[in-house]
Every structure is written in structure tokens, then in C-alpha cells.
Swiss-Prot record:
The keyword Amino-acid biosynthesis applies. InterPro entries: Trp_synth_b_CS, Trp_synth_beta, Trp_synth_beta/beta-like, TrpB-like_PALP, TrpB-like_PALP_sf. GO terms for molecular function: tryptophan synthase activity. It catalyses: (1S,2R)-1-C-(indol-3-yl)glycerol 3-phosphate + L-serine = D-glyceraldehyde 3-phosphate + L-tryptophan + H2O. Disulfide bonds: none annotated. Its EC number is 4.2.1.20. This is Tryptophan synthase beta chain. NCBIfam families: trpB (TIGR00263). Transmembrane segments: none annotated. It holds the Pfam family PALP. GO terms for cellular component: cytoplasm. Its cofactor is pyridoxal 5'-phosphate. It comes from Alkaliphilus metalliredigens (strain QYMF).
């Protein structure tokens, strides 16, 4: 077998490495080390050990009988990534990258976070391995995700509030990149999604593909065949890519990525990058993004802190461009309704990000046949969003 010398830098015309010269050597070294891990049995075994024993994989593929009956149409299965340690899919990637950082002898870990789930996962693994951890987070997201901020600080991470720009994920990412440029010798940057310069989109996908690999095995065991539809929410897009990628060549399986329509795609208050965006460069990659006529990144909005990102992973851009996946958009209001539906019907409180996927499922399922199979990636649990939701749904209680 020929050894992999380097990975493809682009997905069609998307991806690449649009970064300052100071980072090029770091990216080349990162790719070299990552390729080595693919052929390193000890590294792979260590990764499998921690996702199994520490995070609790494999996560269940749960038949949502009540939801199936309510919506009509095909059988609905939920891939329960909410049952991972720390409450979301993010830890799959963090375990892989922090093991890689240790292999590279890096002592300081930095990360960006929107909803706080990637930040919590990074702080958690750094606590376990006794590594210095700095997490950049937009000031607006800090307010929305107070519980996760407290968790990160409890775990020993320094949370840096970013007040520039829209004070959300894009701005936190900008600050993390600045830190990395300044401290590249001893610092490892754990990117939380399938975004950024090569090799990050490929690395994160490879650490997240465990989701789709498990689904394939589990659905064949339960149903004896592959699903007809896969549905997942998309911000940067790592939970969706983790689900989609192992099914890429199974063309009979339809893929649906669900973006945040915010107050509506006809307004300027949304984060529907593929639905409304155009090609450009953001955070070191060529992809679709939300920009004005001058090429400036436009502000984004979503009720969900994990989806309000003005770009999207380049592999998703490629899937859209080639027609392999379908990308749709769901409003704040629709996501809130879906959040309540799943909570009441199945006793599962989803993250607001995942609620966007549920909301699209509510439109898709009734159009499917009774013997169709739909798998939805429940990317995270909703504990972190209770504060936001109680303000929106129960805002008058304090006044009574």
C-alpha cells in the first residue's frame, strides 16, 4: 500500500490555504503529523479508547416512535450525539486534535467557540491531560451561553471575551487566529468545525466521521439496509459532515443540511450561507459566505449560537456545488416549535442547533413513504439553551 504523502488541499474549487506566511510552516507540519497518525496503530487505538471509555461511544441510534407517528411518513431514527460526554458531537474532534497536539509536544491549546460546546469539550480534554487552555468566545455568545462559560472556567480554561465586530463566532475565530500567529511555536489551535485552512476541514471531518460510520453499522443491524434520508443542522458543518461523509458514495441516500434562517432569509437577520451566500475567502478557506458588494462579511443572526457563522465548511460548499447534498434553511420560530415538539413527544431536550434539523424533519417526514428510513443527527442536548428558551417562552412568569 502506498503511503499518503499529502492530502488534497481543495474540494473542487473550495478550501485551500489563505493564511499569512507565518502560518504556512505550521500548517505543513500539522498535515505531516496528521498523515502519520492515520498509519499509526497506537494513535488510532488511543483515539478509539478515549471516545469509547471517556466519551461513551458508540452513541445509540434511537427509533423515535412517537415522533414517527406524529409526523407520518417514514421511520425516524435519532443519532444520539447529545449523549456524548459534554453533551454534543464536538468531543469526537477535540479528543483527536488534542491527542495530535500532545504528539506534536504542544503545551498550550487555544480554541474558538460559539455555543460553548466546542469550548467545553476542549477545556474538558485539556483538564484531563493537564494542558493550558484558552478559549475565545464572542461577548454576545457569552451572555447567551452563561452555563457553558461557567463550565469552561470550572475546568480551568481562560475564557476570553471578544467584543469586536458582531461579538459572535466569526470574531472569536479571528482572535484565535491572531493568537495562533503570535504564538505558533508552542500553541496548538483546535478548530471546532470543518472550516479554516487545509488540513483542518479534512482533519475535523476524519475525527467526526465516526458518527456516520456508526450509523451505517447500526442501521444495517436494525433495518438491514441503508437509510433513504440523512438530516443534520449546519453552521460550520462538522456534525453534518461527520454523518454525511461515510454515505457520500451511496447515491441513493439523500443528504439534507439545515442552515439557520434566523428571522427569515428575506431579511438581513439570518445565517443561511449556502441559501443566500456567494463565493469568497473567510478564515483561510475559499467557500460560500455572507458578504456585501464590497466583499465585507455581513453580520449574521440565529437564535442558536452554534449556527450564526457567516461561512460554511468547504466540503459542504463542494457538496452543494456538485448537487450531492441539499441545503435548506429554518427560522428561529420554526426551531423553537421543533424544540418543544421533540421535548414533549420523546422526552429529549435538543440543543437549539439540533432543533433546526428537527424543524426541517417536520416538513420532510410527511412527504416520505411509510417504508422510508430517515436518520437525523441529534448533535447536542439543550441544557445550554434553557436560559434562552425560558426567556422566549416563559418570559412573563417573573411578572406574575
Amino acid at each position: 500500500m502506498m503511503k499518503v504523502k499529502e492530502l488534497p488541499k481543495k474540494f473542487g474549487k473550495f478550501g485551500g490555504q489563505f493564511v499569512p506566511e507565518t502560518l504556512m510552516n505550521a500548517l505543513i507540519e500539522l498535515e505531516r503529523q496528521f498523515i502519520q497518525t492515520k498509519e499509526d496503530d497506537e494513535f488510532q487505538e488511543m483515539y478509539r479508547y478515549y471516545v469509547r471509555e471517556y466519551s461513551g461511544r458508540p452513541t445509540p441510534l434511537y427509533y423515535a416512535e412517537n415522533l414517527t407517528k406524529k409526523l407520518g411518513g417514514g421511520k425516524i431514527y435519532l443519532k444520539r450525539e447529545d449523549l456524548n460526554h459534554t453533551g454534543a458531537h464536538k468531543i469526537n474532534n477535540v479528543i483527536g486534535q488534542v491527542l495530535l497536539a500532545r504528539k506534536m509536544k504542544k503545551k498550550r491549546i487555544i480554541a474558538e467557540t460559539g455555543a460553548g460546546q466546542h469550548g467545553v469539550a476542549t477545556a474538558t480534554i485539556c483538564a484531563m491531560f493537564d494542558l493550558e487552555c484558552v478559549v475565545y468566545m464572542g461577548a454576545e455568545d457569552i451572555e447567551r451561553q452563561a452555563l457553558n462559560v461557567f463550565k469552561m472556567e470550572m475546568l480551568g480554561a481562560e475564557v476570553v471575551s471578544v467584543t469586536s465586530g458582531t461579538a459572535t463566532l466569526k470574531d472569536a475565530t479571528n482572535e484565535a487566529i491572531r493568537d495562533w500567529v503570535a504564538n505558533v511555536k508552542d500553541t496548538y489551535y483546535v478548530i471546532g468545525s470543518v472550516v479554516g485552512p487545509h488540513p483542518y476541514p479534512t482533519m475535523v471531518r476524519d475525527f467526526q466521521r465516526i458518527i456516520g460510520d456508526e450509523v451505517k453499522e447500526q442501521i444495517l443491524e436494525k433495518e438491514g439496509r441503508l437509510p433513504n434520508y440523512l438530516v443534520a443542522c449546519v453552521g460550520g458543518g462538522s456534525n453534518a459532515m461527520g454523518l454525511f461523509y461515510p454515505f457520500y458514495e451511496d447515491e441513493a441516500v439523500a443528504l439534507y443540511g439545515v442552515e439557520a434562517a434566523g428571522l427569515g432569509v428575506e431579511t438581513d437577520q439570518h445565517a443561511a450561507t449556502i441559501t443566500k451566500g456567494s463565493m469568497g475567502v473567510i478564515h483561510g478557506m475559499m467557500t460560500y459566505l455572507l458578504q456585501d458588494e464590497q466583499g465585507q462579511i455581513t453580520p449574521v443572526h440565529s437564535i442558536s449560537a452554534g449556527l450564526d457563522y457567516p461561512g460554511i465548511g468547504p466540503e459542504h460548499a463542494y457538496y452543494h456545488h456538485t448537487g450531492r447534498a441539499n441545503y435548506v434553511a429554518i427560522t428561529d420560530e420554526e426551531a423553537l416549535e421543533a424544540f418543544q415538539l421533540l421535548t414533549r413527544l420523546e422526552g429529549i431536550i435538543p440543543a437549539l442547533e439540533s432543533a433546526h434539523a428537527i424543524a426541517y424533519l417536520m416538513k420532510l417526514a410527511p412527504k416520505t413513504k411509510g417504508d422510508d428510513i430517515i436518520v437525523l443527527n441529534l448533535s447536542g442536548r439543550g441544557d445550554k439553551d434553557i436560559h434562552t428558551i425560558s426567556k422566549l417562552l416563559g418570559g412573563n412568569r417573573d411578572d406574575k
